[in-house]
């Protein structure tokens, strides 16, 4: 009797798997419904053209002005960059089918690493598939339980995740608060190495880290300085070296991580640049480097040409800066609050998640592509539409964007 009960009552492996899958679907459906209900659902628009100031979007007739790309210098569709990618593809193939330390290193990879190090005036550089990987691979390889890392509370998610992976003692200081950083540095004096980690420019707020003060405190308390320059490389500073050049502390920042996927052609890839022994250690221990395929040759060729163009002239940097000032001044004159410093990331602060999402949708109806950001990407109550200016936007593009903001803002009560 008992055996019969067990036979008929127990679920077969197939039925147990089906039951577990059904439970998972129920949990996921509930999570997704919660996101929709909160008004924070993120939809992916499908672009059917090249990246640029004017794009085509699936389902929408006519050209759309793009104000939400990281294409700060407009190099993602630059003819010379595209041609360099094609030539490298033809000469070196589609990919390496290998990691760097096996048979995935070509001369072009070493040449690009040398060019990056020269550009940043550092000893050496190492390429990664993305800057997310560079951040994920740095802290775990460098820091031990004897060490400490001190991180700005609004650092990019990739920095936060990278720090979580390491075994160092972790301190978080209030955003841009140098008094709090100093207090944390005092607490961390007992540790072997102390590394202050910060974004150079913060991607959601458009504000710039006070690197002069950070470097001063680091020197005072015997700490190293790490800066993520993803939203600075190529266009901040007189020659586009980044926030350390902008603020005159290039010789005081120890480690820089940045990307090839934004201003420098926009294709893909990231890197770490700094002291030669550090880069050598990363080649031996950094897991994203050791266990990821090499950057495709075409991506390497595009990035290398983008750096060449940047080092030939800073005219494109000046153009982007002038257009950024134009947008910010006109938006503020219209009554909007635009966060951050004179950075091409221009967050139009709205506060309410639904409002930012609805206004972004209505901006698209007027031919302007922008994105609303809300929790959990930004803190609750800090929803905004992030506008990003490119050197290849015309003054007419800027003015048309501002006019659309004014019309949509009045429609939704964001302006009187």
Curated annotation (Swiss-Prot):
Similarity comment: Belongs to the class-II pyridoxal-phosphate-dependent aminotransferase family.
Q: In which pathway does it act?
A: Amino-acid degradation; L-threonine degradation via oxydo-reductase pathway; glycine from L-threonine: step 2/2
Under which main EC class is this enzyme filed?
A: transferase
Disulphide-bonded residues: none
| Pfam families, alphabetized | Aminotran_1_2
Q: Which reaction does it catalyse?
A: glycine + acetyl-CoA = (2S)-2-amino-3-oxobutanoate + CoA
The protein depicted here goes by the name 2-amino-3-ketobutyrate coenzyme A ligase, mitochondrial
The cofactor required is: pyridoxal 5'-phosphate
Q: What does this protein do?
A: Pyridoxal phosphate (PLP) dependent enzyme, which catalyzes the cleavage of 2-amino-3-oxobutanoate to glycine and acetyl-CoA. Catalyzes the second reaction step on the main metabolic degradation pathway for L-threonine.
According to its UniProt entry, the protein's GO biological process terms are: biosynthetic process; L-threonine catabolic process to glycine
Name the InterPro entries on file: 2am3keto_CoA_ligase (IPR011282), Aminotrans_II_pyridoxalP_BS (IPR001917), Aminotransferase_I/II_large (IPR004839), AON_synthase_class-II (IPR050087), PyrdxlP-dep_Trfase (IPR015424), PyrdxlP-dep_Trfase_major (IPR015421), PyrdxlP-dep_Trfase_small (IPR015422)
* Residues bearing the modification N6-(pyridoxal phosphate)lysine: 262
Enumerate the PROSITE patterns for this protein: AA_TRANSFER_CLASS_2
Cellular localisation:
Mitochondrion; Nucleus
Q: Which EC number(s) does UniProt give? A: 2.3.1.29
PTM N6-acetyllysine: at which residues?
A: 42, 184, 380
Any one GO CC term of the record? mitochondrion
Phenotype seen when the gene is deleted: No visible phenotype.
Q: Which PANTHER family does this UniProt record tie to the protein?
A: 2-AMINO-3-KETOBUTYRATE COENZYME A LIGASE, MITOCHONDRIAL, CLASS II AMINOTRANSFERASE/8-AMINO-7-OXONONANOATE SYNTHASE
Tell me the keywords, alphabetical order.
Answer: Acetylation, Acyltransferase, Mitochondrion, Nucleus, Pyridoxal phosphate, Transferase, Transit peptide
Residue list for modification N6-succinyllysine: 42, 184, 323, 365, 380
């Amino acid at each position: 009797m008992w055996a019969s009960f067990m036979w008929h009552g127990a679920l077969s492996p197939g039925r147990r798997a089906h039951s577990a899958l059904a439970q998972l679907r129920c949990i996921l459906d509930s999570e997704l419904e919660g996101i929709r209900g909160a008004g924070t659902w993120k939809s992916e628009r499908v672009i059917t053209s090249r990246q640029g100031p004017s794009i085509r979007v699936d389902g929408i007739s006519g050209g759309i002005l793009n104000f939400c790309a990281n294409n700060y210098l407009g190099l993602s569709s630059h003819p010379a960059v595209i041609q360099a990618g094609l030539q490298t593809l033809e000469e070196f193939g589609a990919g390496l089918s290998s990691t760097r330390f096996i048979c995935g290193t070509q001369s072009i990879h070493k040449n690009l690493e040398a060019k990056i190090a020269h550009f940043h005036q550092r000893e050496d550089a190492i390429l990664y598939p993305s800057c997310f990987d560079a951040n994920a691979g740095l802290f775990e390889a460098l820091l031990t339980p004897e060490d400490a890392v001190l991180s700005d509370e609004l650092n990019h998610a990739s920095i936060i995740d990278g720090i979580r992976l390491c075994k160092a003692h972790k301190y978080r200081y209030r955003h841009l608060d140098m008094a709090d950083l100093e207090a944390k540095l005092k607490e961390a004096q007992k540790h072997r190495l102390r590394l202050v980690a910060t974004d150079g420019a913060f991607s959601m707020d458009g504000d710039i880290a006070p690197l002069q003060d950070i470097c001063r405190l680091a020197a005072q308390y015997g700490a190293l300085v790490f800066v993520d320059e993803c939203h600075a490389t190529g266009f901040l500073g007189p020659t586009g070296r980044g926030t350390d050049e902008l603020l005159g502390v290039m010789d005081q920042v120890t480690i820089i991580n940045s990307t090839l996927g934004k201003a420098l052609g926009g294709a893909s890839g990231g890197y770490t640049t700094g002291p030669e022994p550090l880069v050598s250690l990363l080649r031996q221990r950094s897991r994203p480097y050791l266990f990821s395929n090499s950057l495709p040759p075409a991506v390497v060729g595009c990035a290398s040409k983008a750096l060449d163009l940047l080092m030939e002239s800073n005219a494109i940097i000046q153009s982007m800066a002038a257009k950024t000032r134009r947008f910010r001044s006109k938006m503020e004159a219209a009554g909007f609050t635009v966060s951050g410093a004179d950075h091409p990331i221009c967050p139009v602060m709205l506060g309410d998640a639904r409002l930012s999402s609805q206004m972004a949708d209505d901006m698209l109806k007027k031919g302007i592509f922008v994105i609303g950001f809300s929790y959990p990407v930004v803190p609750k109550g800090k929803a905004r539409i992030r506008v990003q200016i490119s050197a290849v936007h015309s003054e007419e593009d800027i003015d048309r964007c501002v006019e659309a903001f004014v019309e949509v803002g009045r429609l939704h009560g964001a302006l009187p």
